[in-house]
């Protein structure tokens, strides 16, 4: 959510910032709505002041036995009371219209974010590791998994339809090992606090992190009105909604390993085979709550934490700075990590780390106060994948494939695999 006061004071800068995200000029319309709202509020305050004054005047008139004046004042008060509900309703309607307009506009990008239309305009910040050097033919993960006998799409479709997967035996264990490795790394070495939180949330939580109102079609909703989380960013960030935090206790760093649920409404025909784009998938999420001064440095730190997962797995990847046309709705700046997949002969996103400024905090009313301050400020929020477990599984299968069709377990995962060093075809 944007600060209407800042927009009033900087209309040209606001429009210029959103123009970088291909948004039409909006400042004039927002300011007009705000002026209307302020006018209605002023009228209400005038009515309330006059009602209070007239009520006192009635008492004075009665004391002076000026019944004619008293009756006239009573009629005036009655008229004000009759008109106030209409004015209050107008205030609610205009405020709702302004808030709805503000809530549908994306965040303003930082100045150092590259301008661009889509993913083709993203900028490579760095490349880490080397592509595998083996000589045998590369295969896609679903070919490997099905040949091993531990990846079953037909039974998944029987149970749930398309974009689901059943993993069994050694691949199920590998998936679990990856998630446990990630959560252990982030809690024991990176300073994040593990959180176990609900997988279903109310409208307010989805609004707070920016999924609502614009992106409802990308979500799953239960019949009683709750939403399945598309990412644990929703629950972890909303932990501080409506709260005033102590600045000296910031940053707060949360992590959770949860299933995520997405309808993939805009992905028809894309990645229909395999595990790349699923309705349900495991992800290790990272969220930081900071003060304004620390947010940019925290973004670099969070991205490094996500990169460390891939480094320890020995995977080749690149880090991109997303352009204005490819960033998420709530982000001011985003780094994407793209892992190398030999079977596809390309890089694919495996993590996205974003700094959101106070955009989400305004929607959630999450604030902090300095030790010697009376006034509060909005917190700054950050979120990132540390990382997507399913896509990490894909990367391990394709990068650690042996010429006999088996898959070597990365060294860092061996403590989680019960003595298993490679995954071989089911007997």
From Swiss-Prot:
Output the Gene3D superfamilies linked to this UniProt entry.
Answer: Bira Bifunctional Protein, Domain 2, Serine-tRNA synthetase, tRNA binding domain
Q: In which pathway does it act?
A: Aminoacyl-tRNA biosynthesis; selenocysteinyl-tRNA(Sec) biosynthesis; L-seryl-tRNA(Sec) from L-serine and tRNA(Sec): step 1/1
User: Which positions in this protein are listed as binding ATP?
Assistant: 262-264, 349-352
**Among the entry's GO cellular component annotations, what is one?**
cytoplasm
Give the first-level EC class, as a single word: ligase
Protein localization: Cytoplasm
What is this enzyme's catalytic activity, as reactions? tRNA(Ser) + L-serine + ATP = L-seryl-tRNA(Ser) + AMP + diphosphate + H(+); tRNA(Sec) + L-serine + ATP = L-seryl-tRNA(Sec) + AMP + diphosphate + H(+)
Q: What is its EC number?
A: 6.1.1.11
Q: Which InterPro entries match?
A: aa-tRNA-synt_IIb, aa-tRNA-synth_II, aa-tRNA-synth_II/BPL/LPL, Ser-tRNA-ligase_type_1, Ser-tRNA-synth_1_N, SerRS_1_N_sf, SerRS_core, tRNA-bd_arm
Q: Where does it primarily localize? A: cytoplasm
Biological-process GO terms, alphabetical = selenocysteine biosynthetic process; seryl-tRNA aminoacylation
PROSITE patterns, alphabetized = AA_TRNA_LIGASE_II
Q: Which parts of the sequence bind L-serine?
A: 231-233, 285, 385
SUPFAM superfamilies documented for this protein: Class II aaRS and biotin synthetases, tRNA-binding arm
Q: Which UniProt keywords apply?
A: Aminoacyl-tRNA synthetase, ATP-binding, Cytoplasm, Ligase, Nucleotide-binding, Protein biosynthesis
The entry lists its GO molecular-function terms as:
ATP binding; serine-tRNA ligase activity
Q: Domain of life, per the record? A: Bacteria
Record family assignment: Belongs to the class-II aminoacyl-tRNA synthetase family. Type-1 seryl-tRNA synthetase subfamily.
Entry's free-text remark on domains: Consists of two distinct domains, a catalytic core and a N-terminal extension that is involved in tRNA binding.
Query: What does this gene product do?
Result: Catalyzes the attachment of serine to tRNA(Ser). Is also able to aminoacylate tRNA(Sec) with serine, to form the misacylated tRNA L-seryl-tRNA(Sec), which will be further converted into selenocysteinyl-tRNA(Sec).
Q: How does it assemble?
A: Homodimer. The tRNA molecule binds across the dimer.
- Report what the protein is called: Serine--tRNA ligase
Q: Look up and give the organism this protein is from.
A: Agrobacterium fabrum (strain C58 / ATCC 33970) (Agrobacterium tumefaciens (strain C58))
């Amino acid at each position: 959510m944007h600060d209407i006061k800042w927009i009033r004071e900087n209309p040209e800068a606001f429009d210029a910032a959103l123009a970088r995200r291909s948004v039409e000029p909006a400042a004039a319309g927002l300011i007009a709505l705000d002026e209307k709202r302020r006018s209605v509020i002023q009228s209400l305050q005038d009515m309330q002041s006059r009602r209070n004054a007239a009520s006192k005047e009635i008492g004075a008139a009665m004391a002076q036995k000026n019944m004619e004046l008293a009756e006239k004042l009573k009629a005036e008060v009655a008229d004000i009371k009759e008109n106030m509900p209409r004015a209050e309703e107008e205030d609610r309607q205009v405020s709702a219209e302004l808030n709805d307009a503000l809530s549908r506009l994306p965040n303003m990008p930082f100045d150092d974010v590259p301008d661009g239309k889509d993913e083709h305009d993203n900028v490579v910040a760095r490349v880490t590791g080397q592509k595998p050097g083996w000589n045998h033919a590369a295969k896609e993960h679903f070919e490997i998994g099905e040949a091993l006998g531990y990846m079953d799409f037909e039974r998944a479709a029987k149970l749930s339809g398309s974009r689901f997967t059943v993993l069994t035996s050694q691949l199920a264990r590998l998936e679990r090992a990856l998630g446990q490795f990630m959560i252990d790394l982030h809690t024991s070495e990176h300073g994040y606090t593990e959180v176990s939180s609900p997988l279903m949330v109310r409208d307010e939580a989805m609004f707070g992190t920016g999924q609502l109102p614009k992106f409802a079609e990308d979500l799953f909703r239960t019949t009683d009105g709750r939403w399945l989380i598309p990412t644990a960013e929703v629950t972890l960030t909303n932990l501080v909604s409506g709260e005033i935090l102590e600045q000296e206790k910031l940053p707060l760093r949360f992590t959770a390993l949860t299933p995520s649920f997405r309808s993939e409404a805009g992905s028809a025909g894309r990645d229909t085979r395999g595990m790349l784009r699923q309705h349900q998938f495991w992800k290790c999420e990272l969220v930081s709550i900071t003060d304004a001064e620390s947010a940019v440095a925290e973004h670099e730190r969070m991205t490094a934490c996500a990169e460390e997962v891939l480094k320890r797995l020995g995977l080749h990847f690149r880090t991109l700075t997303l352009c204005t046309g490819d960033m998420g709705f709530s982000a001011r700046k985003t780094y994407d990590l793209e892992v190398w997949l030999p079977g596809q002969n390309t890089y694919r996103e495996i993590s996205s780390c974003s700094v959101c400024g106070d955009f989400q905090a305004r929607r959630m009313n999450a604030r902090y106060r300095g030790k010697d301050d009376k006034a509060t400020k909005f917190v700054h929020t950050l979120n990132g994948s540390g990382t997507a477990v399913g896509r990490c599984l894909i990367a391990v299968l394709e990068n650690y494939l042996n010429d006999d069709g088996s898959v070597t377990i990365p060294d860092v995962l061996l403590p989680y695999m019960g003595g298993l060093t490679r995954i071989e075809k089911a007997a």
